[in-house]
Regions:
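Active-site-adjacent loops and short helices of periplasmic peptidoglycan-processing enzymes
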Residues: 1-142, 149-150
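Penicillin-recognizing serine hydrolase domain
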Residues: 98-223
Length: 223
């Protein structure tokens, strides 16, 4: 557990153990998206075209189709609320041209933040396996969570939504798709600001939870 304003560690156990992070990987993905927005490289209203590769992602997804377009705003919503792998890859391609190029930026940002026990191989957390070189630690997840929630508090506009819908617009016509937040804390925890859950067969269950009460910002990571 970290205090968000100062970065002080309040409680820790095995904080530097390298583990597979599953979808809390997307905290870094969202951090780079928010940076790109603030730097004016992209706008919330920009269209994002979905590649065949992005549409092919398994795991948690919103079933985007090849050549479908959605706004940056909608893509952030899909990643933050539904942990959508297809939307994450589509945004990685939008910002960096390809997922590998985006992952390079993720690792550069991790180094900048002092994340000494982290290496990313993708922007989703899919197929995370320490043997493949995709890993992080509870403390490192806390560092990137602090970067996202403290420097880009606008993310809570998305991460605190319990349920929402998006509209698919494809050759087949329009259809509604429901989103439900994977972080159940947003339903009942007073002061919750986010942030991200993760779950795979290898990682089991992971959580980075952020909350603010009376000016105190707390970040709790469980892996």
């Amino acid at each position: 557990m970290i205090e968000g304003n100062s970065g002080e560690i309040i409680l820790e156990k095995n904080k530097d153990t390298e583990l597979v992070p599953a979808s809390i990987t997307k905290i870094m993905t969202l951090t780079l998206i928010m940076e790109a927005l603030e730097e004016g490289k992209i706008q919330l209203t920009d269209s994002v075209s979905v590649s065949e590769y992005a549409a092919s992602m398994g795991g948690s997804q919103v079933f985007l189709e090849p050549n479908e377009t959605q706004t940056v705003d909608t893509m952030i919503k899909c990643i933050s609320i539904a942990s959508a792998n297809d939307a994450a890859v589509a945004m990685a391609e939008k910002i960096a041209g390809s997922e590998p190029n985006f992952v390079k930026k993720m690792n550069e940002k991790a180094k900048e933040l002092g994340m000494k026990h982290t290496q990313f191989k993708n922007c989703t957390g899919l197929d995370d396996d320490i043997k493949s070189g995709h890993f992080s630690s509870a403390y490192d997840v806390g560092l990137m969570s602090r970067e996202l929630i403290m420097k880009h508090p606008g993310i809570s506009k998305y991460s605190t939504v319990w349920m929402d819908t998006i509209t698919h617009k494809t050759k087949k016509g329009e259809s509604q798709f429901g989103l439900t937040n994977t972080n159940k804390l947003v339903r009942f925890y007073d002061g919750i600001t986010g942030l991200k859950t993760g779950s795979t067969s290898k990682a089991k269950y992971c959580l980075s939870a952020t909350a603010k009460r009376n000016g105190l910002n707390l970040i709790a990571v469980v892996m």
